[in-house]
UniProtKB/Swiss-Prot annotation:
Keyword Isomerase found: yes
Protein name per UniProt: 2-epi-5-epi-valiolone epimerase
Effect upon mutating E76G: Lack of activity
Function: Catalyzes the epimerization of 2-epi-5-epi-valiolone to 5-epi-valiolone. Involved in cetoniacytone A biosynthesis.
Listed GO biological process terms: antibiotic biosynthetic process; L-methylmalonyl-CoA metabolic process
An example Gene Ontology molecular-function term: methylmalonyl-CoA epimerase activity
Cofactor(s) annotated in UniProt: a divalent metal cation
Impact reported for E151G: Lack of activity
The EC number(s) this enzyme carries: 5.1.3.33
Residue intervals of the VOC domain: 11-155
Lineage of the organism: Bacteria, Bacillati, Actinomycetota, Actinomycetes, Actinomycetales
Residues involved in a divalent metal cation binding: H14, E76, H99, E151
Length: 183
């Protein structure tokens, strides 16, 4: 084997989250966050397909939606019905804990907008990191009406970590609306 990584990998295609109510989540991500709905489908496979392919109960069913978030991110949402389903969201400190970070031009303005949205809970006030590898990063977490955590972030180019490595993090250009319909 030569090199590192998955042979032929060219990009991250999507991230996926399981939600308690697909309709509510799609509405939230399209109306509040600004995503675009690409498609929906229902997965109701016969036999042991769900177990073999998705490692869930064989009798599970799923409603699925794929959304586009800005110029480079696809977001897949699942609503499962399964007899052995756990119905508690992991905290960020739990194994499997997660959050989705959205780069915004103005964290304070975005947080204020979210505070006005029904059911959204902004977790404290935005703050700026003043030292370390990401000094200059301004951020705040928020929770959706069903409790999924997301983050607003603005990490300017030229962060201190860039002095130590050739690795550069993706830096968005323009607004999401600049990329509507782009592939």
């Amino acid at each position: 084997m030569t090199g590192r990584g998955i042979p032929g990998a060219v990009a991250v295609h999507h991230v996926a989250y399981t939600v308690p109510d697909l309709d509510q989540a799609v509405e939230f991500f399209t109306e509040v966050i600004g995503a675009e709905l690409a498609y929906t489908l229902v997965q109701d496979a016969a036999g042991d397909w769900m177990t073999r392919k998705l490692d869930v109960d064989a009798t599970a069913t799923a409603r699925i939606a794929m959304l586009r978030l800005g110029p480079v991110t696809n977001l897949e949402l699942f609503e499962y019905a399964a007899p052995d389903q756990r119905r508690q969201l992991p905290r960020n400190s739990d194994w499997g804990g997660h959050h989705l970070a959205i780069h915004v031009a103005d964290v304070d303005a975005a947080a204020e907008y979210l505070r006005a949205q029904p059911g959204v809970r902004v977790l404290g006030d935005p703050e700026t990191i003043t030292d370390g590898p990401i000094a200059g990063d301004r951020w705040v977490y928020f929770a959706t009406p069903w409790g999924m955590q997301l983050e607003l972030i603005n990490l300017p180019a030229g962060a201190p970590f860039e002095q130590q490595t050739e690795v550069r993090l993706y830096q968005p250009e323009g607004s999401w609306s600049d990329h509507r319909g782009a592939s």
